[in-house]
Amino acid sequence: SMYKMGREKSIYNKLIKEKLPATGKKLAIVGAGPAGLAAAFWLSRLGHEVTVYDASSEAGGILRWGIPAYRLPKDVLKKEIALISKLGVRFVFNTAMESKEQWQRLVDANDAVIVAVGAWHETGLGIPGEEVSGVLPAGEFLKAASQNQKPKVGSEVVVVGGGNSAIDAARSALRLGANVQIVYRRARTDMPANAEELSGALEEGISVLCMTQPVEVVAKEKGGKKTVAGLKVQRMKAGPVDSSGRPTPVPTQDIYEIPCDSVIVAIGEKVRVPGLEELGVSKEKDGRIKADQFSFLTSHPKVFACGDAVMGPATAAEAMGQARSVAEYLDEYITGEKRFQKLFRSFDYKMEVPTKLTKAKMTKAIFIPVDARKSNFMEISLGYTGEQARIEADRCLRCDVRETKRRTYSAPLEE
């Protein structure tokens, strides 16, 4: 909304003007994705000298390379990154941290280091035939699409997975002219994907085959090499509830083949941060960094971690929220003062829930019609009109106000 109204310059100038005085503290952030960018934003406003390192050629991480333009226009992202640069943050690209020596130099040169790398190491299917031409990791496919390279996919695409990456890959393949099916081994209600994104995919004509698990990529010879000819799948049934709180998928004897010429794999990603353990930073068995749940300090006294590096694959919003918490604690850790609230205006607020409450459903944003959007990557959500925004604001029962003494309130919530 800020960009559509052309208000960003005045807001940028205000944020730059209200930066706290320089502290003389130097901080390094590894990873220029949602967590790294958010941490850099807050810490630079607090007066610290911040340098962000990233293995890619541009900042943004999953926002730049993974989330399609129809969800997040790249010009908006570029403006956000430009603001962070104007706040004084320095970016160093094409720099991967892969050895103890690199990490040691970073720790020695800074007052603290934040590890904010994303979960980019993709999980394979572990089935026969997945090495043939035409089987693509979702991250690789989405990155190519984000660079307008038009990834090589056939006319019949099967996407394996039930998360947001799977939905993004399916809707992107559709926009590239393919007929798309999603295969997921659990029930639709168990899909971790955002409900609105899944609904959008179904509206656009993408079919979802649930309780279905891949067992083999069927190949054919073409031009002297093996390519995808189909995906052999197995029907599943619901078993006992597992540790995730969902029924365990149990294989049945029903196995059949889905004809296709491309398979996009989106079944999960892992964090890979080589060299840190040799520096004394402890990790979980799956590669995530062990960090205190409140301070986000690791087992090394100068190394913090946040985002995917700690949580594993998470939403951009979760990573950015965690980065704000890290920035607040880190600032106090290196300055010895509680200064974070100086970034916000103080005001009086009567912390009371209105005595008269009326039910009001959530206002839905305006979306471009299906036929006008499914063949291109233009932004599909037009957001709220001014009147819709006012109505939605009126639904609030109280503001999320920070207090020195935290108080707990409860109030009925509407969908």
Q: What are these model-predicted stretches?
A:
Residues 169, 306-340:
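A conserved FAD-binding loop/helix module that cradles the flavin
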Residues 3-21, 79-99, 122-176, 284-294, ...:
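Glycine-rich dinucleotide-binding loop and its adjacent helix/turn
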Residues 131-155, 241-313, 321, 352-354:
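FAD-site-proximal beta/loop scaffold in flavoenzymes
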Residues 203-205, 213-229, 237-239, 325, ...:
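Mid-to-C-terminal Rossmann-like scaffold of FAD/NAD(P)H-dependent oxidoreductases
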Residues 30-35, 161-163, 308:
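Glycine-rich Rossmann-fold phosphate-binding loop(s) that bind the pyrophosphate
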Residues 1-19, 145, 373-391, 408, ...:
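Ferredoxin-type iron-sulfur electron-transfer modules in oxidoreductases and energy-metabolism complexes
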Residues 21, 26-30, 78-127, 216-232, ...:
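Feature captures the FAD/FMN-dependent oxidoreductase FAD-binding
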Residues 25-97, 123, 140, 168-218, ...:
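Beta1-alpha1 glycine-rich phosphate/pyrophosphate-binding loop at the start
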